[in-house]
Amino acid sequence: MEQIEQMAKEIERKFLVDQGLLPKKIIGEEYIQAYIAINDQGIVRIRIKGSIALLTIKTSEKGMTRNEFEYEVPLEDAKSLVELFNDKIIYKTRYKITIDKKLWEVDEFHKENKGLWLAEIELESENESFSLPEWIKKEVTGDQKCFNAYLSENPFKFWNNE
């Protein structure tokens, strides 16, 4: 039996975005994410971006570091899973912006989460320093409401003016 490698550590910080201050000519990619399992231990999701489909497992941990493991899966299988788990879906456009050699992933949410914009930056360590772009409003790292899994069950449109 093949030995499974240890899961990769994901260290990221998350922020609310003022979309009016974003660069004007950025190109995004459409994402569909269906959540297969969400519980206190973590999440299992299927993601479709273009012709690529990924099955992701993330553990639930406090702070900005989590375990993450990701597998590419056949696109048709992913589409079937999205249809099966169609009650917990996120639709978004992801824009990638590099600032000071660091990649920012900015998500514009659609449908039930329209109006919400979030940015993430992955870091090498929890203490790594980086520059905040002018379009960052507020840090929301660790705020469960800003996790995609939470948004799949509690859409932004139902939040009370937050």
Residue ranges of model-derived segments:
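Phosphate-end processing signature that detects enzymes handling 5′-triphosphorylated RNA
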Residues: 1-162
